[in-house]
């Protein structure tokens, strides 16, 4: 379901020839919103990073060009992968991968840092977190954003269950997706259960006419 939604979105953007503007920083909530930006990643020059759910590849290319990181960017949707290659294939220091992030993490050389802008919320934590532990070096960092309130203004869940939502992707009919929209304490508990230390959970408010609130979570592998 999730793969299909983002494949449809990627095809729509390819068909209309849309190119993502090169970002000046990472937007962990909605594009263009104020927030901590790229600074939360720290010093990443020469470090190996994984962008999980990389979409059109703009953040991976930005970190490779401007912060001199070595970035693998993985997405499960073939049309999103195609968009990234069309726009950023010639950027040194970034490699675009098509496939399942969990499979990749279970067989890759460990990374220094894994980050995800609204990608991890589409994966069951009991599947993704063991793979992330395997795919990070000891002491490696995991930084990701997820929804705190959903698109219907409902608060986060206190139980580890996904929600079936209709996501409005610009220019398309609403797409069905499964999302884990969890309370901060539940995220901390499940991360701790998988041997991550949570260093910060921040709530990010979007612009005033957007009721959605995001979480930015920073954790470290044991």
Name each model feature, range by range.
Residues 196, 209-222:
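Core SAM-dependent methyltransferase catalytic element
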